[in-house]
Amino acid sequence: LVFRLLMSYLYENYIYPNKLTNRMKITLIRAEKESGKEALSTLEADALIKKLKTETKAGHVSTLRAILPQLEGTCAQYEHIDKLPRIYPAVEYSRTQEGERRMKNYNGLVQLEINRLSGIAEAEYVKRQAALLPQTFAAFCGSSGRSAKIWVLFALPDGTTPKLESDAALFHAHAYRMAVKCYQPLLPFAITLKEPSL
């Protein structure tokens, strides 16, 4: 009963009720090994989700999943790991004239991670469980094939998101803690707790 009341309160006050916007832009950042530079790009959420469903010609994700068991317990890492971008769902970043990264928009997406799964079957189970809650924006398998990511969409009571980076960081930390409390009871695997950051 307490869980249902909490979910009802969150859904009505902090989570976009049926206002999922796929126009929001998600940031992808890739660190280039040779130059040491950071390549930043953005994609609309629906385009990114389509892209995650299909692998590129290079097949870096399939190769990573195949080689990962051989790398366990060693200091070695996948040689093309730099080809896989880090995805920042919470914010749309842009560059200043000086080349510094700055927040352009805060999306209100909180990412929960469930790591150390045995494989794709457990990741698929996590995705099905996450789909039970209406505030789940997306859920997908991680690049290793042994993790799952859940994106939960939060907003202020008026349906907007914070505009200043400092306000967004505080809101995001609070939203992350609430998301963990809501989703953990649905999952037989522990959510990997992280320091919430944009």
Give residue ranges: language-model regions.
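DNA replication initiation on ssDNA origins
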Residues: 2-108
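Short amphipathic alpha-helix segments
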Residues: 119-134
